[in-house]
Amino acid sequence: MFTWTIYVSLLLVLAGTFLMNRNTNTDIIDTFKREVDLPIPAQPGPPFPLVTDYCDIVCGFGRGSAELGIPTANVPINQLPKGINDLDLGVYFGFAHIKTVDGQELSVETRRDGRTVVYNYGQYLSEANDDLSVLPMVLSVGKNPFYGNDFKTMELHIIHDFKNDFYGARVKFNILGHIRPELNYTTKEALIEDINIDIRTAQTVLATPPYQVFKQQL
């Protein structure tokens, strides 16, 4: 009887310790912590999640892929809900789903830098390659001060190995959390390093069950 009482008491102490240490609002990212990083709760909290309708994927400057090795999908700000337009400048994360636009012929558009891109409306996306699955992403909401932009852009880096471009396709996405504010950089290498940390942070958080359930929104 005495032994059983001690055993039960020990279980209660351990359970109490677990509950005291369990906080759904504590930061779950330790590995990639930087001074500028914001706390990421164990599950999305207000104002998240934010969800879009399907919006067009348009050409930007082409820097993400050509200069940084991190391709992005640009979306028009005027196609996004007000709650997303009102977000602070910075880096966010969530999930994205791309769909093709049927019945469109290939067309050529000119980027801001004067170069041309082919709009294929996603016709080369492959289900076999999981291109049309719900995928993790990081979102830059900002003016890209490193490049001296004076207007805000919305750029998604979808964390997936696409084999082809998909300008003209449509994307729907949710935003589940905020990684850090927008920063300026003295070197391109520092910018690339931070983006890669953002990507690893998003992958780590989005792989947890409380975040995985939000794939169902898309």
Swiss-Prot record:
Gene Ontology molecular function: any one: riboflavin kinase activity
Residues the record marks as active site: E155 (nucleophile)
Lineage: superkingdom: Eukaryota
Family annotation (Gene3D superfamilies): Riboflavin kinase-like (2.40.30.30)
UniProtKB keywords: ATP-binding, Endoplasmic reticulum, Flavoprotein, FMN, Kinase, Magnesium, Membrane, Metal-binding, Microsome, Mitochondrion, Mitochondrion inner membrane, Nucleotide-binding, Signal, Transferase, Zinc
Functional pathway: Cofactor biosynthesis; FMN biosynthesis; FMN from riboflavin (ATP route): step 1/1
GO cellular component terms listed in the entry, alphabetical order: endoplasmic reticulum; intracellular membrane-bounded organelle; mitochondrial inner membrane; mitochondrion
Pfam families (UniProt xref): Flavokinase (PF01687)
Ligand binding (Mg(2+)): T72, N74
Keyword Magnesium set for record: yes
Record's cofactor remark: Zinc or magnesium.
Subcellular location: Microsome; Mitochondrion inner membrane; Endoplasmic reticulum
E.C. no: 2.7.1.26
UniProt feature coiled coil, ranges: none
GO biological process, one term: riboflavin metabolic process
Note: FMN1 is essential for growth on rich medium.
PANTHER family according to UniProt: RIBOFLAVIN KINASE, RIBOFLAVIN KINASE/FMN ADENYLYLTRANSFERASE
Protein's name according to its UniProt entry: Riboflavin kinase
Organism: Saccharomyces cerevisiae (strain ATCC 204508 / S288c) (Baker's yeast)
Gene: FMN1
